[in-house]
From Swiss-Prot:
GO (cellular component) term, any one: 6-phosphofructo-2-kinase/fructose-2,6-biphosphatase complex
Keywords: Acetylation, ATP-binding, Hydrolase, Kinase, Multifunctional enzyme, Nucleotide-binding, Phosphoprotein, Transferase
Activity regulation annotation text: Phosphorylation at Ser-33 inhibits the kinase and activates the bisphosphatase.
Record: residues binding beta-D-fructose 2,6-bisphosphate: R258, N265, G271, R308, Y339, R353, K357, Y368, Q394, R398
Protein name stated in the entry: 6-phosphofructo-2-kinase/fructose-2,6-bisphosphatase 1
Modification Phosphoserine occurs at: S33, S141
Name of the gene encoding the protein in the UniProt record: Pfkfb1
PANTHER family: 6-PHOSPHOFRUCTO-2-KINASE/FRUCTOSE-2,6-BISPHOSPHATASE (PTHR10606), 6-PHOSPHOFRUCTO-2-KINASE_FRUCTOSE-2,6-BISPHOSPHATASE 1 (PTHR10606:SF15)
Primary role: Synthesis and degradation of fructose 2,6-bisphosphate.
């Protein structure tokens, strides 16, 4: 093999090396050509559909999910680019015969695609969600050519809805609060937005089963009453399609809480499978009274397999379902130890966990990263359900809360989930509304903040600086 043939050049795509050729380098390709598409090439998720079809809702939820499972993902909302370029006046900006506006909109799309390239090829992103109408074949061809030039995979998500009640509700919930309509009369907003939809309908070209048979896509009809999936290419696209087939928009609330205070909580010991303390039992009855006062229709109750969650649920006097996936994080060799004992016997492990709490795995135990993977089926079922009460544990509750509140892996292990407090999560248009309800039963504090000094050579006093008081 010649020296030239043996050289490898790293492309801007993550961790991909290709043979170097001095005569026709792929890195110096001419415009319009393409680079190879590898198995782990980044993916562009392209939204398609008329306005008020839930595209931004889908984009936001999908991005939150993919980030939660560890796939770096970012939304690029074309409406934001357009608002930065020009102030909105009325629906006439979207008329197909408004050539000046058409040019502005195309320039905004190109600016967004430039940022997509920066994110996927330079900032270690793996999935870019291009949130726009993309209703014409011309616009989709532009995006496909862009993806081909940079070696990205493409997966289309088309949301189709012909139910006028669903469309009207979407306009009411989302568009009335849009930056395009600040301080506008509600009736005028509705009138203008319906005319905007009419502008798009003139040139709308849905994905076609025959003409687009070579493309990868999922079509969602009437917010999930029917799906059509075509040519799923890889793991990311498969998980995306599966996730989208599990979400719904039915109004509901999810109640998250920890078990009542346990005997090991009182003694400052982590893990184990102890029963409730006297105050923990008092909380269990307080929780039962609270749930009854809420008059929640068709409530499902989930617990872990551990004694303390089961004892808490028993006080409710209703059927409950046990999930092994909801068990507390496995602390391995550190099970039932206090933080002081861990520092004494495993000072290096204690410091390593403080350095990267999300990825650190207890010897013979689990990490938060492991726990997220274990909880993915729970998240899928929560998305499918309506009203649910989940009685779980501190680390588990942190993982679930991070999903619903879109928290990063750095934030996740330090989310505060105190004992004897219920969090009521109500999904709204682009996020989740949180209500914290303390049930007025005292309990020990089990939250430990990250200490300032996380070095392995630190003094024991520095390592234990943030340990909460216990008996």
């Amino acid at each position: 093999m010649s020296r030239e043939m043996g050289e490898l050049t790293q492309t801007r795509l993550q961790k991909i090396w290709i043979p170097h050729s001095s005569s026709s380098s792929l890195l110096q390709r001419r415009r319009g050509s393409s680079i190879p598409q590898f198995t782990n090439s980044p993916t562009m998720v392209i939204m398609v559909g008329l306005p008020a079809r839930g595209k931004t809702y889908i984009s936001t939820k999908l991005t939150r999910y993919l980030n939660w499972i560890g796939t770096p993902t970012k939304v690029f909302n074309l409406g934001q680019y357009r608002r930065e370029a020009v102030s909105y006046r009325n629906y006439e900006f979207f008329r197909p015969d408004n050539m000046e506006a058409q040019l502005i909109r195309k320039q905004c799309a190109l600016a967004a695609l430039k940022d997509v390239h920066k994110y996927l090829s330079r900032e270690e992103g793996h999935v870019a969600v291009f949130d726009a109408t993309n209703t014409t074949r011309e616009r989709r061809s532009l995006i496909l050519q862009f993806a081909k030039e940079h070696g990205y995979k493409v997966f289309f998500i088309e949301s189709i809805c012909n139910d006028p009640d669903i469309i009207a509700e979407n306009i009411k919930q989302v568009k009335l609060g849009s930056p395009d309509y600040i301080d506008c009369d509600q009736e005028k907003v509705l009138e203008d937005f319906l005319k905007r939809i009419e502008c798009y309908e003139i040139n709308y070209q849905p994905l076609d089963e025959e003409l687009d048979s070579h493309l990868s896509y999922i079509k969602i009809f009437d917010v999930g009453t029917r799906y059509m999936v075509n040519r799923v290419q890889d793991h990311v696209q498969s998980r995306t399609a599966y996730y989208l087939m599990n979400i719904h928009v039915t109004p509901r609330s999810i109640y998250l809480c920890r078990h009542g205070e346990s005997e090991l909580n009182l003694r400052g010991r982590i893990g184990g499978d102890s029963g409730l303390s006297a105050r923990g039992k008092q909380y269990a009855y307080a929780l039962a009274n609270f749930i009854r006062s809420q008059s929640i229709s068709s409530l499902k109750v989930w617990t872990s397999h551990m004694k303390r969650t089961i004892q808490t649920a028993e006080a409710l006097g209703v059927p409950y379902e046990q999930w092994k996936a909801l068990n507390e994080i496995d602390a391995g060799v550190c099970e039932e130890m206090t933080y002081e004992e861990i520092q004494e016997h495993y000072p290096e492990e204690f410091a390593l966990r403080d350095q990267d709490k999300y990825r650190y795995r207890y010897p013979k135990g689990e990490s938060y990263e492991d726990l997220v993977q274990r909880l993915e089926p729970v998240i899928m079922e929560l998305e499918r359900q309506e009203n649910v009460l989940v009685i779980c544990h501190q680390a588990v509750m942190r993982c679930l809360l991070a999903y619903f509140l879109d928290k990063s892996s750095d934030e996740l292990p330090y989310l505060k989930c105190p004992l004897h407090t219920v969090l009521k999560l109500t999904p709204v248009a682009y996020g989740c509304r949180v209500e914290s309800i303390y049930l007025n039963v005292e309990a020990v504090n089990t939250h430990r903040d990250k200490p300032e000094n996380v070095d392995i050579t630190r003094e024991p006093e520095e390592a234990l600086d943030t340990v909460p008081a216990h008996y």
